[in-house]
Amino acid sequence: MVTNLKIALAQLNPLVGDVIGNVDKLISVRSKLENSVDVLVAPELYISGYPIDDLVLREDFLDLVDKGLENLAKATKDCKSSIIVGAPRKEKNTIRNSVFVIENGDISTFRDKFELPNSGVFDEQRIFTPGNLSGPVNIKGVRIGIPICEDIWKENVIECLAESGAEIIVSINASPFTLSKNNERLSVAISRIRENELPLVY
């Protein structure tokens, strides 16, 4: 267990469909950090790129995403920084917008997005199936809640994480750029912090 968890945010610009390039870029960033951080965090749907739209409905593309996650896992065999990263996940006949925890050469766990937006430029309810409300993950002895984007806009998701023992919230996000949106996002983040008395990395 660590007493001070060092988190790096990889605010990279993935290309939609370029799974190999996106993975290679993240591996390169991680190798440059060496032992300076405990957790490297990449955005929502980073592996596939975002917005993904109908590309995520292709079986061959989902296979490529799985291969990309496997390659990321191999890169963590050195037992240095863990990776939190977003990617689509196929489960039987459904596709989910998920976040993966990758460490020590393995995909240790995942969580699925609960709140799927379906307005304006967002069309996630058509292509994804929502996950369940779930608890935090344990990374290096710290219980971390990892909601995905829209999840922090609803009180119940963070409340569930807090009630199930989260010590910190790390929310991954990917959205089209909107000039006037930053203040609104900040307001939502502050509301979740005040309601649950938990630190939040966004």
Language model features with spans:
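Enzyme catalytic cores with a strong preference for nitrogen-chemistry domains
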Residues: 1-202
